[in-house]
Structures are given as structure tokens and as C-alpha cells.
């Protein structure tokens, strides 16, 4: 993306948290201190919630359909990375990580679509890493599967449309006929 040279407000940026446990402990300690609370003991992460704890707050995630819509329309890499890690946790019952996410994607594509990613390297969920390596044939197999099974997957309707939505909404190269309103694509 582009950042304007003259900007009077801070530019909002989002980044994937590399270690959610360390971040969670750090942000909890910081927030308690800012609120004037004293913590007697150690802030720590637990794998299982002890029965005697009382939930003070709960923040539910947006529904998956909304997350996918935002991720695809706005090219939201933070959501892509987070969903990849969560997929690894949910599908494989392992700690959420990029490696677990990559293994889950491989397993799902193999079991559901018959697509073997073989030697492909999946380093993150967003595709930003230079270590992501996939052949054109493998990518085409995935895209063909999505196109042939979109009645079930419902992904194509979430993609940006030239001149209308998301990252293609104001992209100059697709603002004129015959492309405007006729190109549905994922940028990046």
C-alpha cells in the first residue's frame, strides 16, 4: 500500500502477534498497571481454566463469514495469519502456530480436495513471507477446486469487485469498461 507524505493523524497499522502467550501476559500486566491495579503474584498463561476462577469479561470473535469477508475484501493479513493459526489449533488439536496452520491446510486440501501440496512451503497464513513457495500447478489446483465447489465454499462472492469493493474498489487499472464491475479477484 501507499502512505501519504502529508498526514495529520497517526497511521493505523496492525501486525500479527508472533507469540500470543508472551503478548497476553505483557498486555495484561500493562493494562493492570495503567488501571492502577496491583497484581500480587505472577501473570501466567494456563492451558486449562481452573474451576474456581470467575470470568470477568468475554470478548467473542466475529463470525467466521464476517472475518473471511473482511480478510478477502480488504486483504487483511492480520486476520489471514490469525485464521491460519486457529485452523491449526482447531483441525489438528495442537497449539496455534503457523506450522500447525500449514499442516492443517495441507491436510484439509489433501482430504477434502485431493490436492497434495507436496514440496510447497507455507510459512504463514497471509502469504507475506518470502518463505512461502507454491508451484503454479498447485495454486491452479486450489483455484480450480474453489471455482468448482463455490456453492459449498461461498468464497468467490467475498472477493473484491473492480470499481465496487475492497482492494479493487478504487484501483485505477480496473476502473473502466470492460473491467469495472466485471473483474472479481484477490489482490496480493
Task: Name each region found by the language model.
Residues 1-153:
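A small/polar active-site loop signature that marks catalytic segments
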Residues 20-21, 150, 170, 176-179:
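Extracytoplasmic
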Residues 39, 166-170:
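Short low-complexity stretches enriched in small and charged residues
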Residues 49-51, 100-101, 163, 176-180:
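A short linear-motif detector with a strong N-terminal bias
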Residues 54-60, 172-188:
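Short, Gly/Ser/Thr-enriched beta-strand-loop segments that form substrate-interacting elements
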Residues 122, 159, 183:
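Short clusters of hydrophobic/aromatic residues that line enzyme substrate/ligand-binding pockets
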Residues 149-166, 174:
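Active/binding-pocket-proximal capping segment
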